[in-house]
A protein has these predicted regions:
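Terminal, low-structured helical/coil segments at or just beyond the last alpha-helical repeat
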Residues: 149-175
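Alpha-helical adaptor scaffolds
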Residues: 69-75, 85-139
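A conserved position within tetratricopeptide repeats
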Residues: 51-55, 81, 88-89, 124, ...
């Protein structure tokens, strides 16, 4: 596919990439990536990129979503929640919460439990067995003081994926 098409589709995934290379090629890969080799620098450059994209196109929902994702990485949850709010206002495809969970983190850490629960309900309507959405639903219940429902959600997440360590941690934490 042409690079322009790849770039267009990749945009909705925060331009995340995974490096796969033989260990003896690490110096070459480091040279190719330059400043992007360092994870913190890479994330800061991504944050800067999406801030600039929003300046040039404030109606780009993916840029707002990606800004939120990078703000979550730096634990700037309040700003991240605001970026996700804007992305949601502009409209996102249903699939956005299948593999990207930044909004759950942002709303949880800003104690916006109603928003967290609304998002998890939305995600579970699309994919009823999504263990990540079940996990965050459980954390929402926990923050709301409903420990029994939290445990049920964490157990449901583990029923979907018995190796889901985050759900096991959550279950152990609330018990």
């Amino acid at each position: 596919i042409p690079y322009s098409t790849l770039e267009e589709y990749w945009h909705s995934f925060n331009n995340v990439y995974v490096l796969v290379y033989p260990p003896d090629k690490e110096p070459t890969v480091r040279d190719i990536l330059g400043d992007h080799w360092d994870v913190e620098t890479n994330r800061q450059l991504a944050l800067d990129k999406y801030q600039a994209q929003i300046q040039s196109n404030p109606e780009d929902a993916f840029a707002w979503f990606n800004l939120g994702t990078n703000l979550v990485y730096f634990e700037h949850y309040q700003e991240a929640a605001q970026a996700y709010d804007r992305a949601r206002e502009l409209g996102l495809p249903q699939r956005m919460l299948r593999y990207q969970f930044g909004p759950f983190f942002a709303y949880f850490h800003t104690r916006r439990i109603d928003d967290l629960m609304a998002l998890t309900e939305y995600a579970l309507q699309i994919t009823p067995n999504a263990e990540e959405a079940l996990l965050w639903q459980g954390w929402g219940y926990y923050r709301a003081g409903d420990t029994n429902s939290a445990i049920a959600s964490f157990q449901a997440a583990l029923a979907e994926n018995s190796n889901y360590l985050d759900a096991q941690y959550a279950l152990d934490f609330v018990r």
